[in-house]
Amino acid sequence: MKGLLLIILLVLVSPFAEAEMREWKTADESKTLVAEYVSSRDGKVTIRRKRDRRTFTLDLTALSEKDQDYVRQREDSPAGNDPGEAGDADGEFAKLLTGDWERAEGHGLKYRIFGARKLRKGKGPGYPLVVYLHGRGGDVMTPEEPWGARAFTRDDNYRRRTCFVISPQNPDQQGWVGTKADGVVEIVKELLKKLPVDPDRIYLTGYSMGGYGTFQLLSQEPRMWAAAVPVAGGGNPGAVRDYRKVPIWVFHGAEDKVVPVGQSQAMVEALKEARSEVKYTEFAGAGHGVADRVYDDEKLHEWIFEQGR
């Protein structure tokens, strides 16, 4: 019980942005939070904080009588009125959902985006979002489909795992750091507002420089990602505790001469020491070019889309 109360206090003690949706209170009415109702069942309620869109599931009894009554009313109301249902795609963003790779720009970055036309209409909690970070020298803005990211949009795969996919363009090819990493995060936040994206199913992956970027963004925004797949990359082993609870599957070629395999090995070892349930696949005899081997593997896609926050 003490652990539960600590979680509730941590959730509610944070300062919040201007009022929107409704104000929630703890049972003793000492702490408040502005958030939206998402769902409830079996004596628990899930709410989404306005400030950063984080979701929390709390025991109903930990909230005020007024909040408990509100939740019961929500449960009795028609499902179509549930604010937890994803809304429809907004304006100009809806036009980007054509069933083909379209071009967009925002927050200092150009990017490609893919989504089927049917994703213009919200359904349930929304659809997954996959973020793919290219390697050094990569150009996702050519007429071709973005290499690496296109594996998620192939017809046979997409029919079973319908989702949004974005691939940002790194403007200077000098790593997914600084304003470039910030730009990726801001694009994701904007898409959460403008498209029916499920905030609990946002997946991050990248190859080579993008593999480094994957670890960087895990460290920068650990609560944003439902799963991550760094391929032939590396990162800072000292930062892994921040995201040790995120499901991660690391891939590397044992004979990589561009990014030594020790880069991934060090990250995996640090994650294991932090008690992460990290998965690691090392391809014997393989060099740096393992991306196709990774992204063409059906087991990888099955694993990614099984994950949720």
Task: Locate each region found by the language model.
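A domain-start/cap signature at the N-terminus of enzymes
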Residues: 76-129, 207, 217, 265-268, ...
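Gly/Ser-rich "nucleophile elbow"/oxyanion-hole loop immediately N-terminal to the catalytic nucleophile
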Residues: 118-125, 173-209
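Compositionally biased alpha-helical segments
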Residues: 16-101, 105-108, 161
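Primarily recognizes the serine-hydrolase "nucleophile elbow" in alpha/beta-hydrolase
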Residues: 194, 200-244
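Sec-dependent N-terminal signal peptides
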Residues: 4-13
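Short, proline-enriched alpha-helix->beta-strand connector loops that line the catalytic pocket
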Residues: 161-163, 243-248
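C-terminal catalytic histidine-bearing segment of alpha/beta-hydrolase fold enzymes
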Residues: 231, 247-251, 257, 261-309
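Active-site machinery of serine-nucleophile hydrolases
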Residues: 129, 133-187
